[in-house]
Design a protein with these regions (language model features):
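Short catalytic/metal-binding and nucleic-acid-binding patches
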Residues: 1-177
Length: 177
């Protein structure tokens, strides 16, 4: 079994990718967005953290969090969010023998990707990645049209223009990005 080593910076800012176990076609996260939001809210009440940026796609999500000073326990937060969400779902998913033996649901991948944000440039690059993701995956043509993202918050704060990442149109023909 691989030995995963996670970077833990107390009070740090982190980028995450969290995936459903069965990715395609699966719209569980957007179909149950209110359950996901409530799961996050409940965890934030008990284990505070700031959501700097976030996008929820049908089968995975990306988030940037900043943890409180002296706190580096993002893994427990994700574990608890996944548990709350899973408990709210009807148990209809396929579960492998291993998951059955361990008493696990078959909703989430066990692990998640994390990256410690190094500086302002790294933060900005990951915010761009978060917000362009619905376009990258073909869910919308314009970033501003995806409803499950912090993009509108960034526009309201003057960080992005409303038409950010939209290709220019010349005589009705879409241009390159």
């Amino acid at each position: 079994m691989p030995d995963y080593r996670r970077v833990r910076v107390p009070g740090g800012t982190y980028f995450f990718t969290v995936n459903l176990l069965e990715r395609y076609p699966n719209d569980l996260l957007v179909r149950h967005i209110d359950v996901l939001r409530e799961s996050v809210r409940r965890v934030r009440c008990r284990y505070p953290f700031h959501i700097d940026a976030c996008v929820v796609l049908p089968d995975h999500l990306h988030a940037i969090w900043t943890l409180p000073e002296g706190d580096a326990d993002y893994a427990d937060r994700w574990r608890t969010i996944k548990q709350h969400f899973s408990r709210a779902m009807a148990s209809t998913e396929y579960r492998s023998e291993v998951r059955q033996r361990r008493g696990e649901r078959g909703i989430w991948q066990r692990r998640f990707w994390e990256h410690a944000i190094r500086d302002d440039r790294d933060f900005a690059a990951h915010c761009d990645y978060v917000h362009i993701n619905p376009v990258k995956h073909g869910h919308v043509e314009r970033v501003r049209d995806w409803p499950f993202s912090t993009f509108s918050r960034f526009v309201a704060a003057g960080i992005y223009p409303e038409h950010w990442a939209e290709a220019p149109s010349i005589d009705g023909v879409q241009g390159d990005r």
